[in-house]
Amino acid sequence: GYHEAHLTGTAGANGYTMDDLMQDDLGLDGIGCTACHSIDDDNLAGRSNGDLPINDENVSWGGFENPWDGLMSGQTGFIPVFGEHMRNSEVCASCHSLYTHTQDLQGEETGQVFFEQTTYLEWVNSAFNAENVQCQSCHMPLVEGGAIAATQPNWLFPQRFGKHHLVGGNAFMLKLMRDNAVQLNLSATPVQFDSTIARTVASLQHQTAHLKVRQLATSPGEWAFEVEVENLAGHKFPSGYPARLSFIEFILTGPEDDTLFHSGAWSPANGINGRDTGLEPHWNEITSPDQVQIYELVLGDVEGATTQVLERAAILLKDNRLPPRGISSQHPTY
């Protein structure tokens, strides 16, 4: 299986090291095509932690309903077969439903299970699920009409399939990879990175959240504003890895373009100005520049202290991330 292949040569070892990775062709290959296209339709919604049901019959599930399989099966050994489940969110569930086994400060497991990432479950408990808006609708938008996938055969396939954009929210990582492609031995070109970065930024700007600012009635010499943030995504905003956060930068300028108030100032050297070292509380009202609205998940260990060590996560100290439209506190996944 796929996961076993990544563990080649680790029998009797203490763990899979970076040195092992650098000598492992499959490890260097990362998440290849077959990691997803070999997933069988077997209780996908109930899986988590990367527990993928990988078939062992060299079947490659895809979106073409009547594929011409001669060339692919002959050249690669994989037989292309139509799989309806490849168009559904359930195929994303296992890798985007993640729980950890809590450890105390001595590294001993406490017996507690902590749900670290619940992106798929957030989608299940949303209006997007009820409206049949799948994960792929945003992250792998469909191509309309036919497309020539190869030189043989040279006719158009009349089926729709998903563009493999797989855009997330991490433009910073993509820029870091682009600028260090030689050191990382990456085959993607700067142009290819730039196109993905552009899609990522466009998704963040137009498909992720919507801001409304309204000035409230106040006394002379005072200003007050109401800021409304609407989550447009089919999961929490932000979602996934706990270190992800979103914050509001609010700037009020005067007639001479002078800054009268600035909350959420950010700089590469100092990060978010005013952010508390331990935990920045959720604010219903901000009256000082050292108060900043940060939407985030903050983990706590067994002693209640903040932690970024995933295995030590025991409690939620803060989770004011914006839920998706239609979420219900009565849903089994809540």
Residue spans of the language-model regions?
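Primarily the internal scaffold of c-type cytochrome electron-transfer domains
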Residues: T8-Y334
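Acidic, Gly/Ser/Thr-rich repeat motifs that build Ca2+-stabilized beta-propeller blades
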Residues: G1-H6
